[in-house]
Amino acid sequence: MGHKVNTLSNRLGLIVGWQSLWYSHYPERIKEDFKIRKYLENRLSKANISRIYIERSLNRVIITISSSRPSIIIGKGGSEIDKLKKELNIFIYKKIQINIFEIKKPELDAVLVSKSIASQLENRGSYKKAIKICISAALQVNAEGIKIKISGRLNGAEMARKETYKEGRIPLSTFRADIDYHMTEAHTNYGIIGIKVWIMKGEIYGKKNLFNIFKLKYKKKKVYSD
């Protein structure tokens, strides 16, 4: 089963927490969250955003953004944050709080690794070179394993094919294994190329507070909170 389902959803509630923390009015809230994430990802495309967490209370919405380039999001003296709040009022009619966390080791973040490979492919770079660089970088910062699967018309070949690159161990059926996973697409002149990335960071033993998003073994540094 661990090889078929989404790696993160398979661990949801065990060692992986929820990216949206709220209840009630599910259809409205899920649609609103989707619009917020889509807008922020497009608006902050140069900031290397990994994940966006949304928490709602009665009178406030807390948006937590993890990024490897937080200075782009914050701006000089927090000026960009103020702009973001005004722009987000299109979707949200409550008080907005924005927290920014810096990812100290982007090589261990599956979202950023997959986006990096996709960016190089869209700029007509070699997919083999891009993958080898990402694997080497992850292992240098003590990843226990990394697996990258790429599929599509690689190098403009007439027939689509799949290739898999793996170093170290990726125990998908071990629930205590802290494996980050992400899937993205590269839009090239030859069509869409799919990219999947798994990164094994270690194993988590005992209970874990799933609602305290950033107090993890692999910590992120909080750089801004209004």
From Swiss-Prot:
SMART domains per record: KH (SM00322)
Taxonomic classification: Bacteria, Pseudomonadati, Bacteroidota, Flavobacteriia, Flavobacteriales
One GO BP annotation of this record: translation
Assigned protein family: Belongs to the universal ribosomal protein uS3 family.
Species the sequence originates in: Karelsulcia muelleri (strain GWSS) (Sulcia muelleri)
Alphabetized UniProt keyword annotations: Ribonucleoprotein, Ribosomal protein, RNA-binding, rRNA-binding
Name under which the protein is recorded: Small ribosomal subunit protein uS3
Xref: PROSITE patterns: KH_TYPE_2 (PS50823), RIBOSOMAL_S3 (PS00548)
Coiled-coil portions: none
GO MF annotations, alphabetized: mRNA binding; rRNA binding; structural constituent of ribosome
